[in-house]
Amino acid sequence: MCVSQDQLPQQLRYELKTAGIPLEAVSLYAVNLEKNQLLLDVNSKEPRNPASVMKLVTTLSALEILGPNFHWKTEISYRGQLKESTLFGDLIVKGFGDPSLTLEQFWILLNKIRSRGIQKIKGNVIIDRSFFDIPYHNPSEFDGKPFRPYNLGPDAFLVNFNSIKVTIVPDKKNKNIKIYSMPTFKNIKIKNKLKWSMRSCWSWPDTPKLVKENVVFEGLYSSKCGVKQRYYSMLSPDLYTAEIFKKIWKQLGGSIEGQILNGIKNSSDSFLLDHRSFPLTHILRTLNKHSNNVTARHIFLTLAYEQNNGKSVSTEKARAKISTWLKSIGLSPSEIIVENGSGLSRISRISAYQIGMILQRAWDSPLMPEFISSLPIIATDGTMRMRMRNTDLKGMGHMKTGYLKGTRTIAGFLKNKKKETLLVVCFINHPKAKNSWPIHKKLLTWLYERT
């Protein structure tokens, strides 16, 4: 039997009242997929901000449009003459939006170039980022936190998510705080003004400030917080790429006499090699397990790749492609707003019912295993790793979460006590939404135990 608004379980009503969230701000939709039985339907057709649950739309559209074995490429060419181990001219690197070009993969790419016999580059290294035809992205615009990687914009030649790993270590012997970063850059000076504290670790100063040319960490850091690691995007993509390129190229025994510059690959340039990314299915795990926004943006833009025959893609072209896809699966594009594919948006809108239809299509698809395996497992990994760890629900579901100011969402698949698979969606849009995890927890528990 479907539970309507008037029949909502008392436990859920209690959690809503405790959180100060009216039922009008909540959308619920749940289906027993094996019995084809509607379990919950409350405000399910109300368009709401889905936050990162929008990544489910990006995920399924990518699997169906690009295919599970889609690979991004990075193309290496040169202009001038290659004699013995010396390139008398420019090395050209054209990016096509590979979102998996980590430090390790970038090292492999540069090592491939070295293995083709190039050691000395007498000209410049030209980086062609033109495949993404997008305007300048301001990383401060969304919430004023430009160093946080979730605010990073797409880049057709993105290296290592443009990130620096910062490790904060309390030194109990000397009662001070140490900071380490990797990789290191001469252009970035991290200034440590953190002070030792013995207070409870309910929060820690994880948002540095830019003071002149220094990135400053300041405030009280509790020794009870232990070692903390966080990633930051502190350099422009152009500068980050240039510094990493020079550092690794030198480690490989190479040299560059010119500069590392942005430019355009010419049709007359001589092809050297292609570097292929991990397959889409591998990258989707990074996207959903860790809710990686820039990966979502890259996948979203790449949806327009095939229809443009390898020409540059844009946000407008990607939106047109996803609108066509939504229409093809029976959803109305006019009722859904997909701004950038990541869910990091104030204007994105979709209903719980429509997300339910996306999940239903994924469940019915031959690509169902690839889709579901990309989602975080309850109390096991990704954004669900710390959720419901000491409950019977551990490992019993794959759930995508969403988090923005005024928004908390969750959607995915849950096994109930009878080992039947349930489709679950819960959207909460309200100023007090930050208090809503107990609501999600109670919903999942009730569905697990009572349905």
Residue ranges and their predicted role:
Residues N36, K55-A62, V125, F157, ...:
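Residue-level preference for non-acidic, small/hydrophobic
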Residues C2-P47, N111-R116:
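Beta-lactamase-like hydrolase cores
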Residues V42-R48, Y231-Y232, S342-S345:
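A short glycine/serine-rich beta->alpha loop
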Residues L28-A30, T74-I76, A411:
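Short beta-strand scaffold segments in enzyme catalytic cores
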Residues L38-D41, H290, F300-T451:
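Small-residue-rich helix-loop
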Residues R13-L16, I65-P333, E449-R450:
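Conserved serine DD-peptidase/penicillin-binding transpeptidase domain
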Residues D41-S61, I65:
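Short active-site loop at a secondary-structure junction
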Residues E46, G97-P99, I428-K432:
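A generic structural motif
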